[in-house]
């Protein structure tokens, strides 16, 4: 896949664990710095919070409930560069830890 100069690559990262997400951002930034790409910006997106309400008892006591929440932390890395290095292949081949969902968009 050929990439034109002055193009932008957006990498969207999502995870339930914010520490894992930050280490993944650092790893991608190291990959870009090793290939002489300096135009990297990290944008934190709002955290999604889902709350699930569950009855504790199977039959009665509707007043007794438990609440569980799942937080989804999100970041966007915007990489703009002007070089002959194929950053897209390096990002696809990068070994990110399990538990981090990433999407790579070319624009």
From Swiss-Prot:
The highest taxon in the source lineage is Eukaryota
- Give a yes or no for keyword Ribosomal protein in this entry: yes
Its Gene Ontology cellular component terms are: chloroplast; mitochondrion; small ribosomal subunit
**A Pfam family it matches:** Ribosomal_S10
User: PANTHER family in the record, alphabetically?
Assistant: 30S RIBOSOMAL PROTEIN S10 FAMILY MEMBER (PTHR11700)
Give a short account of what the protein does: Involved in the binding of tRNA to the ribosomes.
Record protein name field: Small ribosomal subunit protein uS10c
- Organism of origin is Thalassiosira pseudonana (Marine diatom)
């Amino acid at each position: 896949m050929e990439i034109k100069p002055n193009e932008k690559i957006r990498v969207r990262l999502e995870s339930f664990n914010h520490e894992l997400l930050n280490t993944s951002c650092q790893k991608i930034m190291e990959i870009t710095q090793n290939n002489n790409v300096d135009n990297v910006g990290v944008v934190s997106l709002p955290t999604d919070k889902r709350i699930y309400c569950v009855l504790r008892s199977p039959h009665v006591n509707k007043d007794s409930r438990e609440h569980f929440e799942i937080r989804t932390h999100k970041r966007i890395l915007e990489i703009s560069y002007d070089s002959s290095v194929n950053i897209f292949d390096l990002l696809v081949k990068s070994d990110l830890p399990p538990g981090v969902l990433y999407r790579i968009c070319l624009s």
